[in-house]
């Protein structure tokens, strides 16, 4: 699905990967993390014959970019920044998410989860029905409260996180046919405020709870 990122560095170097939020951002009481997938939540797919809206162009002509990038609604960036959390890319796009996705959403360079190359563990998890991201995300969070937004989350993942993660966690599955919706943002906003010990201000219908900036 990914194709080629038109902003990918072509000289053999890799874009910088931010591995963690610095202490100055997290402070003594860190906000919840939000691990964000791209394909499904931000780039809807698989709902043929539905025609998806197109927002701008995927890439310059001849750049070999992924045409599905044009499905990314820039409004997601506004809504994500309103959530009281620290955003982290948790996607197979890895560093390309900062190069290709973040600019379309008006987001800064975000930390990126890098997936460990442990084929034996991955094969074992797959046999047990555990998603290949789950173990790495729990390790990355290191006990910190987190929400994980993905289109492939199952009961097995929720049970594993409940047994292995000491802090609050929300594993929120998004319908890949629609991507993130207002209802999803409402659920995320409420949970993140509760996990972060914040009040729940009244908001107009369709708006995300909270003025705090994510990222």
Locate each region found by the language model.
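Intrinsically disordered, low-complexity regions enriched in small/polar residues
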Residues: 7, 23, 37, 54-57, ...
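Serine/threonine-rich low-complexity intrinsically disordered regions
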Residues: 5, 44, 60-62, 66, ...
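Alpha-helical substrate-recognition element adjacent to the catalytic core
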Residues: 19-20, 26-123, 193, 214-215
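A general structural signal for short secondary-structure junctions and capping/turn motifs
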Residues: 25-26, 79-80, 139-140, 164
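Non-catalytic pre-domain segments flanking phosphatase-related domains
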Residues: 2-36, 46, 197-215
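C-terminal cap/substrate-recognition subdomain and adjoining C-terminal extension
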Residues: 100-215
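A broad, low-specificity signal marking well-ordered, structured residues that form hydrophobic/aromatic
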Residues: 10, 87, 172
